[in-house]
């Protein structure tokens, strides 16, 4: 249950850190949220395991409501680093900027700040490549969104195109992740007002090689490293494409999330995109479906591989699997339904094929299915991550 709303005074040059689940409303004075200026009746929402910095230059009174586990903390300074403001001021009207940094380094906050400070000059394109903690698309996907007005959160942007990757991190299968980014890049074309957010996988040679490839594919004009140390390979890749490389500080206050919190955030997102799902059954011969990551493999063989691997791992739910059907086990493979000229797939949980030859899946989508691409993440019917299929091909 949300707590009773309380009014908190925020002193001049101070920041109220709203920790979700929580909401706030400006009662008196003025606020700035990552470059966004809310009105007095607007409710600002911090989702679970996320935070919003509400900065007041001259002081304000804010009405705050906290959900279970939420919080509010006032710090006596502006938590946005000075070098963020300097970076924003240095950008002209045309730029393609990519932000790279480790998890919980403030990448999304920086992208949001740059978006809000530049969108008043004209529309902005945002590419979200963080397939595990995306703001604008489901987990296991990357996306493009076009924005035309400021917003306290990038989650308010509607995706223009969504590209399934199949995993929650490029570390599972970098080749597949790069293929998806290349497809996204071809859609962007020569767009000159672009912000690119990336995932937080930066430690190790494979991670740095992957980020270098992102630079080479997207050819940004600016590469921004946030809170990072030595990165010679990223410097080299930036020089190859003629990008200006800049280092900026992490925010002064960052909400740290452990592995379980990031997993819980993904599960909330699955639930959001699968809300209203029901079990559908259609004859297998009517369904055009293929494995997303092994397009040449027959779907039935892929199902056997998924179920067999779970059995080898001694997963307890496989005892309830009946042949190629997982309905009784209450699990399904996260999949992507395409129809018509839509550029955003609907999500589904593919439960397998029953002994009567019917394909069974949970989805909120009610229309005709042109293609179902079956991914690699296994979820329960209450949208918990149960298992991830190991890549069978080289990364």
Cite the ranges covered by each PLM segment.
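Preference for solvent-exposed, low-hydrophobicity sequence contexts
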Residues: 1-99, 113, 122, 141-142, ...
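Nucleotide-state-sensitive switch-loop elements of NTP-binding domains
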Residues: 77-100, 122-195, 199-202
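The conserved Walker
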Residues: 103
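Conserved lysine of the Walker
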Residues: 107
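Active-site catalytic pocket residues across diverse enzymes, especially alpha/beta-hydrolases
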Residues: 118
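A short acidic (Asp/Glu
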Residues: 136-138, 205-209, 216, 233-236
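Conserved P-loop NTPase nucleotide-binding/switch module
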Residues: 194-218
């Amino acid at each position: 249950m949300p707590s009773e709303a309380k009014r908190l005074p925020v002193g001049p040059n101070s920041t109220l850190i709203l920790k979700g689940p929580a909401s706030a409303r400006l009662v008196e004075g003025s606020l700035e949220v990552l470059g966004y200026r809310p009105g007095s009746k607007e409710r600002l929402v911090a989702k679970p395991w996320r935070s919003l910095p509400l900065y007041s230059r001259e002081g304000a009174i804010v009405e705050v409501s906290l959900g279970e586990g939420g919080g509010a903390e006032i710090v006596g300074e502006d938590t946005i680093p000075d070098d963020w403001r300097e970076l924003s001021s240095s950008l002209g009207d045309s730029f393609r900027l990519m932000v790279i940094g480790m998890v919980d380094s403030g990448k999304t906050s920086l992208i949001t700040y740059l978006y809000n400070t530049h969108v008043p000059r004209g529309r902005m394109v945002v590419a979200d490549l963080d397939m595990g903690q995306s703001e604008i698309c489901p987990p296991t996907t990357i996306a493009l969104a076009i924005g035309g007005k400021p917003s306290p959160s990038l989650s308010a942007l509607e995706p223009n195109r969504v590209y399934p990757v199949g995993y929650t991190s490029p570390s599972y299968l970098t080749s597949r992740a790069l293929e998806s980014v290349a497809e996204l890049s071809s859609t962007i074309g020569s767009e000159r007002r672009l912000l690119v957010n990336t995932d937080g996988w930066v430690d190790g040679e494979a991670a740095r090689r992957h980020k270098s490839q992102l630079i080479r594919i997207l050819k940004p004009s600016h590469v921004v490293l946030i809170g990072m140390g030595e990165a010679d390979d990223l410097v080299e890749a930036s020089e190859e494409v003629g990008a200006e490389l800049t280092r900026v500080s992490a925010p002064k206050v960052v909400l740290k999330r452990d592995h379980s919190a990031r997993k819980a955030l993904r599960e909330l997102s699955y639930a959001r995109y699968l809300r209203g799902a029901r079990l559908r059954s259609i004859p297998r011969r009517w369904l055009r479906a293929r494995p997303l990551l092994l397009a040449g493999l027959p779907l039935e063989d892929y199902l056997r591989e998924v179920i067999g691997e779970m059995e080898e791992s001694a997963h307890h739910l496989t005892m309830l699997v009946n042949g190629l059907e997982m309905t009784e086990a209450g699990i399904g493979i996260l999949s992507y339904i395409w129809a018509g000229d839509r550029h955003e797939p609907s999500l589904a949980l593919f439960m397998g094929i029953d002994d009567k030859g019917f394909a069974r899946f949970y989805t909120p989508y009610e229309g005709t299915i042109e293609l179902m691409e079956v991914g690699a993440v296994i979820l329960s019917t209450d949208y918990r991550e149960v298992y991830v299929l190991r890549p069978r091909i080289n990364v």
